[in-house]
Amino acid sequence: DDSFKPQQSITRAEVAAIVYRIYTGDVKDAYVKNYETYNKFADMAGAGWAKGYIGYCANAELIVGDGTNFYPAQTVNGYQALAMILRAVGYDQNDEFKGSGWEIRVASTAQQLTLLKNIGATSLSGNASREMVAELLFRALVYAPMVQYTSAFGYQPVVSLTNVNIYDGTVKVDLNGQTLGMATFGLKQS
């Protein structure tokens, strides 16, 4: 109905749709139908409108489910929403958001990236509201540097070359970590 309903809980399918859009930049959903048959999950029969989003995100390893099912109609808690968002930025390439204690690792990573400002840990364990997910997505788009993982160096920022200046034969280069918002939508930090 085109309304936001900020206090309403958000489902796993809805978060997958949002993560797809911020990760690909396909905000008009021009290509999402191409991914409807890419699903690895057994419970997609009732996913309807969300099949393409879930298919893309599953194959890009932005969502994981339980290995067999995704449970698209279930609501997400804050930890689950954060895990999906952090995967879009580049985290969990070393599977640190899986297994025992994954919630602590998700919260710790989000805290280091300042995504949890004014959001308490108790808020993360309950159903995530649309408002909370919107705030977390905004912070991830604008402030969290995208990363790549290598076994030798761990997580390293994806670097964009900016402000290349040649003055008096001297080359000055500023390297800035690139956020998902910069990469996908050309957003700039002020």
Spans of model-derived segments:
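Feature responds to low-complexity, polar/acidic, surface-exposed segments characteristic
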Residues: 1-16, 20-51, 59-79, 86-127, ...
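RNA/tRNA-interacting regions in translation and RNA-turnover enzymes
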Residues: 131
